[in-house]
Amino acid sequence: MGILIEKVNTERFSMDFFRFGTGEKTVVILPGLSVQSVMGAAEAIAAAYQSLAERYKIYVFDRRSNLPEAYSVQDMARDTAEAFQTLGLRDVCLFGASQGGMIALVLAIEHPELVGRMVLGSSSAHVREEQYRVIEEWIRLAKAKDREGLYLSFGREIYPPSVFKQYRETLIAAAGTVTDRDLQRFVILAEGTKGFDIVSELDKIQCPVLAIGVFEDSVLDSDATMEIAEKLDNRPDFRLYLYTGYGHAAFDTAPDYRQRILAFFEQGSGEMRSEP
């Protein structure tokens, strides 16, 4: 599969992204918070989304290259919108995972012309004090330059125990490649979630939405997805699905996750129900 790794340059910043796929329509993926840049996982992501690549051109965006000292989720969204506009992307099928879902929400609210359909994965319309505790611990580990501790805490919180056990040694090995710059970027991006709250603006979203959550989300809590549903479930174009047993990173661990995304982008109809 051909993967093109590129950079979009605006007057204010540059942003790395990669793209793959041969379809006519466009899917954009906004990944969640990660210890290292998503660009290093381009091949793995392209392989995971191969079923969508046969029908779509898929863009995966990193955050901007040079981060300011303070960088809120709203700032991330506005920069991502500018990157979209520079590349001529509009009316896209948008998938945002975790923090990427927060960015997607702001995009859909502030730039409805850019988003045609939206899937939110393990995300939230707010980050309150109790939700910030896990992120705050990651920030502490990153500031202490405890690379292994950070990667292990990250894996322990986002994966179910069986998956964490399976990947523990891989996470330890990955920690050895983390640079000081990676840690600095991580802290800025993680701190940017503090105080995020757009619950009162959710009714401004104009596009169809599928919210996918997890009952055992130990990062943002399963209630976060349900709260989005409470604001949008009176709309005929809103769908909700909740997993059991796959952890916060169900977008990586649930075997049928990408098929659900594809079905929503392709049809946008039919009842979506939670697993028993």
Predicted regions and their residues:
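Acidic catalytic loop of the alpha/beta-hydrolase fold
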Residues: 216-220
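Catalytic histidine-centered segment of alpha/beta-hydrolase-like enzymes
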Residues: 246-256
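Conserved acidic catalytic loop of the alpha/beta-hydrolase fold
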Residues: 75-92
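Short beta-strand/loop motif that positions the catalytic acidic residue
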Residues: 205, 211-213
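Short alpha-helix in the alpha/beta-hydrolase fold that links the catalytic acid
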Residues: 42, 207, 221-230
